[in-house]
Amino acid sequence: MFVKLLRSVAIGLIVGAILLAVMPSLRKINPIAVPQFDSTDETPASYNFAVRRAAPAVVNVYNRSMNSTAHNQLEIRTLGSGVIMDQRGYIITNKHVINDADQIIVALQDGRVFEALLVGSDSLTDLAVLKINATGGLPTIPINTKRTPHIGDVVLAIGNPYNLGQTITQGIISATGRIGLNPTGRQNFLQTDASINHGNSGGALVNSLGELMGINTLSFDKSNDGETPEGLGFAIPFQLATKIMDKLIRDGRVIRGYIGIGGREIAPLHAQQGSGMDPIQGIVVNEVTPNGPAALAGIQVNDLIISVNNKPAVSALETMDQVAEIRPGSVIPVVVMRDDKQLTFQVTVQEYPASN
C-alpha cells in the first residue's frame, strides 16, 4: 500500500514538472484584483426626500368623547391620522376616525395642537374634512394633478399607528380600481403592500417624490378562515378625495345624483342582439328602487341600459359615478333595450338618500 502511494506521488511530480517545462506561463500566478469601494463616495438608496416633503403635512387626529363613568371627562375614543391639504387649514381624514366625537384634536409634527372643526363627512367614501385655525404657515401635502398612480409605483404610507408617533412604511401599488370592499361604498381603492395599521387611517399614501397618491383607509385584519393576511392595505385615490373635500367645503355635505337602479355590465359578446344589429354592450338592470326615479320613468328589471345622459353605459360603477355628478332635479335620457326594441326614458334625477 505504501509503495503504491509513493508511486502515485512520484508520477504526479513528474507530470507537473513536464507541464511547467512545456508551459512556462503556469509558473506565473496573477493575483485576483479586488475592487476598492469607498463608501463615502456613494449615496445609499433613500426616500428621505419624499418623507421630508410630505411628512410634516400628516397630522395625528384624536377623537375625544365624554365618559359618563368618569364624571363626564373627555377621553380619547379613537385615533387616526389626517392630511393638511391647503394653507386655509383644511384637513382630510377618514369618517370612521371622527365618528361620534365630542371633540376633535389635531396634533402637528412641529408640536402645535389644535381643536378642529368638523366641516362635513361622507359615509359612501368614508371621508371627512376638518378645519383648524392656525396662525402662521401650515405644511401642506404636495399634489400633482397630472400624476396618475400606476401598478408597481413605489409608495410610502405615513401615519400614526397605535399612537406610537409618526411612522413611515414602504411598498408598491399592488392594484388600482379595487371595488366591492365596502358594499355601500363608492371608492375605487388603490391596493398597496405598505403596512397600514390602526391609527394610519386618514394618513397619506405618497409616491417616491412625496406627492399625494391616496388617503389610507383600511386593511384586512383577518380573512374568512381566520388567517391574518399580509400586504393588503387600501387607500382612496387623491382625485376622489380632493373632489369630495371640495364638495364638503362648498355644501357641508356631498350632493349626489341618483336614479334608483342597480345593475351589472356585460361584455359585447354576451350582450343581447337586436335583429340585424351588432352585439350591444351595456348594463343589465337587476334592481329598481320602488318609487325611485327610474321606476317612475318606466325602467324595469332585466332592461339593458345602453346609454345614460347620452354617454355609453359600459361600467355600472362608472355610470353611477356620472349620475352622481348630475344635480338633482335634472332630467336625463336613459336608453334601454327591451325585447329587441330600443326605448328612451326621461328620468328625473333625485338626490341620493344617503348623501347627508
Swiss-Prot record:
Q: Where are the transmembrane segments?
A: 5-27
Q: Its topology with respect to the membrane?
A: Single-pass membrane protein
GO CC terms on record? periplasmic space; plasma membrane
Phenotype reported upon loss of the gene: Loss of heat shock but not acid stress response of sigma-E regulon. 10-fold decreased survival in acidified murine macrophages.
Matches recorded under SUPFAM superfamilies: PDZ domain-like, Trypsin-like serine proteases
What's its EC?
A: 3.4.21.107
Catalysed transformations (reactions): Acts on substrates that are at least partially unfolded. The cleavage site P1 residue is normally between a pair of hydrophobic residues, such as Val-|-Val
What family does the entry list? Belongs to the peptidase S1C family.
Checking PANTHER family in the record gives:
PERIPLASMIC PH-DEPENDENT SERINE ENDOPROTEASE DEGQ, SERINE PROTEASE FAMILY S1C HTRA-RELATED
Protein name as catalogued: Serine endoprotease DegS
Q: Which gene encodes it?
A: degS
